[in-house]
Curated annotation (Swiss-Prot):
GO terms classed as biological process: chaperone cofactor-dependent protein refolding; protein refolding
Keyword Chaperone: yes
Protein keywords: ATP-binding, Chaperone, Nucleotide-binding, Phosphoprotein, Stress response
Pfam families xref list: HSP70
Main function: Acts as a chaperone.
InterPro entries named among the record's database cross-references: ATPase_NBD (IPR043129), Chaperone_DnaK (IPR012725), Heat_shock_70_CS (IPR018181), HSP70_C_sf (IPR029048), HSP70_peptide-bd_sf (IPR029047), Hsp_70_fam (IPR013126)
Native source species: Thermotoga maritima (strain ATCC 43589 / DSM 3109 / JCM 10099 / NBRC 100826 / MSB8)
Keyword Nucleotide-binding belongs to the record: yes
Protein family per UniProt: Belongs to the heat shock protein 70 family.
GO molecular function, one term: ATP-dependent protein folding chaperone
Protein name: Chaperone protein DnaK
Modified residues (Phosphothreonine): T180
Induction of synthesis: By stress conditions e.g. heat shock.
Length: 596
C-alpha cells in the first residue's frame, strides 16, 4: 500500500477564528476549507452533555443552548494558570487550543488526502514567554511537530512581502483581531523581512467592541421592560451573537436591525421580544475610545523605530476588525495615507505561516525562496541584582534568535550559592516587572565577596522561548532553566508595562539612585573593614576606632533606609578612609609623610 503523502502547513491560531493553509508545489498558497466548507474556523470548543466534543462552527451554533459548556476566546488565557472545568475534569488553555488545532489538522488531512505532521503556528507579537511556550505545547498536544512559532504581523508581512521583492520598504502592520491588538514595523527588502519594532495591547479586540453593543442593547431593553438580559446566560448568548452580526453588517451598511423574539418573559408571563435598529454612527459613538486605544501602541512602535508616520511606506491591515470603516478612517488620518487593503485580513497570517513552513521544510513550492524572518523580543529580559535592581541582559526590540551573557559576582563573604531571578519588563526595579522564574546555582567555592565570577547567559531561540543559564567560571558548575513561568498577572499587565515605565520614570530613577548609593556605601564599608582587619597594626588606634564607629553608623543608616544620613556618612567615610593609605605608605617606607 502506498505511503500517505505528508504535508506541511501554516496555522493562524486566533482568538475568534483560526485558519490553516499550505503551499502547493507551484508555489501558490491555498487556504484549506474545513469540513463545513468554510475557510475560517471559529476558535470555539464545546462539551455536550453526552460527552461529545464539538469544535468550530458546530460548537458555535450550539452556544445558546449550552453556554456553560462552551469555551471561546481561550487564547486570552494562554500562558496562565487558568483551568476550564467541565464535569469532573479540568482542561488547561493548551488542551482547549489543541482541540482547535486537531480539528484544523484533521479537516485539512481529509481535504488534502494525506498526513500533516509539521506546522508553523502564529501568535501575537506581544505574547510573552509563557504564552509562546503554551502555544507550542498546544501544537504538540494536537500531534504536531511545531517547526516554529512566528509573530502574526511578521507572517502577514511575509504573505505581502513576496510581491515586493527587490523594493525596500518600511511597512506597518496594524493587526486588530478578536482579542488582541498588535502593531509591528518591518523593513522589507532583498529577501529579508525584519521586525524593527513591535508594540500592542494584549486585551483589546473585537470582543470588546461586541461587549459595547451588548451593553447598549441590554440597557435599552432594561429601560423598556425592567429586565437585565445579561443575568440570563441564554439571553446573553443571543445578545452576543446579535452584536457580532450587527458589527459585521455595519462595516458595509449604514444601519442594521436586530430582532430577537421571545428573549425574555415578563413578571406576568408575557413573552418579550427585542427589536432594535442600530446605526453605524451609534456603533461608532459606542466604540470610538476603543479605536483611540490603538494610538498609544502605534506611537510607541514608531518611537522605538525612530520613525515618523510619514516614514511608513505601506500600512497593512490584519484581523477582521480592520474592516470597520472607523478603524480605516483612524489609520488614514494618523498616517495621512490610505491603508493597503490588498491582503485578506482574515487569511494573511495563515498564508504567511504556510510560506514560512514550506521554506523551513524545504518543500517543492518553496524552492528558490530565500526569505529571512527577523523577529524581536517584545520586552527587556534580565535578572535581579543587589538591592533589588533589575539588570537588563537582552534589551527590548533585540533581534532573535539571540544569545547574550554578563558576568556577576557574590555579595557576601563565603557565599556558596546564588539565586538567579529572571524578570521581563522595562522598570529599573526588579519587582515592578514580570517575574518569569528562578533557579539556584550551588557549589560555588567559598571566597570573599566580589571574587567569584558567575556568567549568566540568556538564549532566546527562534520561537522566542527563553533559556537561562548560570556558570561559576571558577569551578565550572552550571545550572540552567527554560522559562515556563505561569505568572498570575492579569493579561493587560504586559501592555501596561511600557506605559508604567514612562509614568514612573522619575520615581524609579530616584529609587534606583538610592539603591545604588546604598550598594556603594555597603561596598565601601566592607572594603574599609577588610583593610582595618588586614592592616590594623599599622593604623593609629584613634583613627581605627573612628572608622569602626563610622562603619557601624553607616550600616545602621543603610538598614533604616535613611538616605540623607547614608549620603553624609558615605562621604565622611570616603574622606576619613583616605588617611589609611597615608599610614600604610608611612609604614611601608618607614619615613614621615608630610601633610599637605
Amino acid at each position: 500500500m502506498a505511503e500517505k503523502k505528508e504535508f506541511v502547513v501554516g496555522i493562524d491560531l486566533g482568538t475568534t477564528n483560526s485558519v490553516i493553509a499550505w503551499m502547493k508545489p507551484d508555489g501558490t498558497v491555498e487556504v484549506i476549507p474545513n469540513a463545513e466548507g468554510s475557510r475560517v474556523t471559529p476558535s470555539v470548543v464545546a462539551f455536550t452533555k453526552s460527552g461529545e466534543i464539538l469544535v468550530g462552527e458546530p460548537a458555535k451554533r450550539q452556544m445558546i443552548l449550552n453556554p456553560e459548556r462552551t469555551i471561546k476566546s481561550i487564547k486570552r488565557k494562554m500562558g496562565t494558570d487558568y483551568k476550564v472545568r467541565i464535569d469532573d475534569k479540568e482542561y488547561t488553555p493548551q488542551e482547549i487550543s489543541a482541540f482547535i488545532l486537531k480539528k484544523l489538522k484533521n479537516d485539512a488531512e481529509a481535504y488534502l488526502g494525506g498526513e500533516i505532521k509539521k506546522a508553523v503556528i502564529t501568535c501575537p507579537a506581544y505574547f510573552n514567554d509563557a504564552q509562546r511556550q503554551a502555544t507550542k505545547e498546544a501544537g504538540i498536544i494536537a500531534g504536531l511537530e511545531v517547526l516554529r512559532i512566528i509573530n502574526e504581523p511578521t507572517a502577514a508581512a511575509l504573505a505581502y512581502g513576496l510581491d515586493k521583492a527587490g523594493k525596500e520598504e518600511k511597512v506597518l502592520v496594524y493587526d486588530l483581531g478578536g482579542g488582541t491588538f498588535d502593531v509591528s514595523i518591518l523593513e522589507i527588502g532583498e529577501g529579508v523581512i525584519e521586525v524593527i519594532a513591535t508594540a500592542g495591547n494584549n486585551h483589546l479586540g473585537g470582543d470588546d467592541f461586541d461587549q459595547r453593543l451588548i451593553d447598549w442593547m441590554a440597557e435599552e431593553f432594561k429601560k423598556q421592560h425592567g429586565i437585565d438580559l445579561r443575568e440570563d446566560r441564554q439571553a446573553l448568548q443571543r445578545l452576543r451573537d446579535a452584536a457580532e452580526k450587527a458589527k459585521i453588517e455595519l462595516s458595509t451598511k449604514m444601519e442594521t436591525d436586530v430582532s430577537l423574539p421571545f428573549i425574555a418573559v415578563s413578571p406576568s408571563g408575557q413573552p418579550l421580544h427585542l427589536e432594535m435598529r442600530i446605526t453605524r454612527s451609534l456603533f461608532e459613538s459606542l466604540t470610538r475610545d476603543l479605536v483611540e486605544m490603538t494610538r498609544g501602541p502605534i506611537e510607541q512602535a514608531l518611537n522605538d523605530a525612530k520613525l515618523s508616520p510619514q516614514d511608513i511606506d505601506e500600512i497593512i491591515l490584519v484581523g477582521g476588525m480592520t474592516r470597520v470603516p472607523m478603524v480605516q478612517r483612524f489609520i488614514k488620518e494618523f498616517f495621512g495615507k490610505e491603508p493597503n487593503k490588498s491582503v485578506n485580513p482574515d487569511e494573511a497570517v495563515a498564508i504567511g505561516a504556510a510560506i514560512q513552513a514550506a521554506i523551513l521544510a524545504g518543500t517543492e513550492g518553496a524552492k528558490g525562496r530565500d526569505i529571512v524572518l527577523v523577529d524581536v523580543t517584545p520586552l527587556t529580559l534580565g535578572i535581579e541584582v543587589k538591592g533589588g535592581l533589575f539588570e537588563p541582559i537582552i534589551p527590548r526590540n533585540t533581534k532573535i534568535p539571540v544569545r547574550k551573557s554578563k558576568i556577576f559576582t557574590t555579595v557576601e563573604d563565603g557565599q556558596t550559592e546564588v539565586e538567579i531571578r529572571v524578570y521581563q519588563g522595562e522598570r529599573p526595579i526588579a519587582r515592578e516587572n514580570i517575574f518569569l522564574g528562578s533557579f539556584k546555582l550551588v557549589g560555588i567555592p567559598p571566597a570573599p565577596r566580589g571574587v567569584p565570577q558567575i556568567e549568566v547567559t540568556f538564549d532566546i531561540d527562534s520561537d522566542g522561548i527563553v533559556h537561562v543559564s548560570a556558570k561559576d567560571l571558577g569551578s565550572g558548575k552550571e545550572q540552567s532553566m527554560v522559562v515556563t513561568g505561569r505568572h498570575k498577572l492579569s493579561e493587560d499587565e504586559i501592555k501596561r508595562m511600557i506605559e508604567d515605565a514612562k509614568r514612573y520614570e522619575e520615581q524609579d530613577k530616584r529609587l534606583k539612585e538610592e539603591i545604588e548609593l546604598k550598594n556603594r556605601a555597603d561596598d565601601l564599608a566592607y572594603s574599609v573593614e577588610k583593610t582595618l582587619k588586614e592592616h590594623g597594626d599599622k593604623i593609629p588606634a584613634d583613627l581605627k576606632s573612628r572608622l569602626e564607629d563610622m562603619i557601624r553608623e553607616l550600616r545602621d543608616a543603610i538598614n533604616r533606609n535613611d538616605i540623607p544620613k547614608v549620603k553624609m556618612l558615605f562621604d565622611d567615610l570616603q574622606k576619613e578612609s583616605m588617611k589609611i593609605g597615608e599610614y600604610l605608605y608611612k609604614s611601608a617606607t618607614g619615613g614621615e609623610t608630610s601633610n599637605q
